[in-house]
């Protein structure tokens, strides 16, 4: 209810400024004891050999640098994913690069992996004191040639390995040039092979297994989804996140800002991402768990993703439009049902 009063004020601000103000405010409320933990009784969901206190997580992108982990966790999330992070700090694309389309409950972003770099992220994670399930989302620097992308992912994997509950490999952002080519069969075969080999080496070295999740795009043909599913199983990936933002503009092309360049998220992505989940589930047959993301604007949207085959879900744009109550409503609905982990 409180968010319904605050949202019009936040929407008067530039979207990126509002984003910063929101994170700063949450941190202040947490530090001063004015942000109580929202907890709902829920049977833990076991996915990737991890016990998630509830199946509703925060998607990567909201807290890129891990500066607000504990405060965001207080909103009732069962897990938090930070990033995308790259080996070296980078400023991302020029501003403006974040656009609201309120008539469609949508957002377009072309942020470009702006982040403080993996070393600073690790410092922030350590300082947060967060003890819940934490995913760290990794990517490549914009100036790293595509043929050297594997090196960037391996650098990040080595550095975050002991600090993450699981690691997400982002190969599906539309805002880093050529990145989505890593979803092609040849490139993906090489990347997954290298990641699995390094994960095995790190597991042997540290005596700890940190799962790997691959985040894919919603703009894939059925044949591509089939190939990706086969490669995920071949290389024994631990999870797949479906999906990232879309380059399609159905439902917003006629609206102000609707044709801005970048990835579209929010309500227009809901059905598209759920369709990808359903197709993946059909191919994977529970061999690899699916984390559903993209256009969860209501608890019902999340439930439909679970019914399509997801074991967990993640929220981001829905939080911007519906506020923190979306988290508790979604947790309440999903935890009132019997959920089966992959």
From Swiss-Prot:
It is a peripheral membrane protein. The keyword Cell membrane applies. GO terms for biological process: 'de novo' pyrimidine nucleobase biosynthetic process; 'de novo' UMP biosynthetic process. PROSITE patterns: DHODEHASE_1 (PS00911), DHODEHASE_2 (PS00912). It comes from the Bacteria. One of its GO terms (cellular component) is cytoplasm. Binds 1 FMN per subunit. It is found in: Cell membrane. Its cofactor is FMN. Pathway: Pyrimidine metabolism; UMP biosynthesis via de novo pathway; orotate from (S)-dihydroorotate (quinone route): step 1/1. Pfam families: DHO_dh. It is an enzyme of class 1 (oxidoreductase). InterPro entries: Aldolase_TIM, DHO_dehydrogenase, Dihydroorotate_DH_1_2, Dihydroorotate_DH_2, Dihydroorotate_DH_cat, Dihydroorotate_DH_CS. Keywords: Cell membrane, Flavoprotein, FMN, Membrane, Oxidoreductase, Pyrimidine biosynthesis. Monomer. Belongs to the dihydroorotate dehydrogenase family. Type 2 subfamily. HAMAP family: DHO_dh_type2. This is Dihydroorotate dehydrogenase (quinone). It comes from Nitrosomonas europaea (strain ATCC 19718 / CIP 103999 / KCTC 2705 / NBRC 14298).
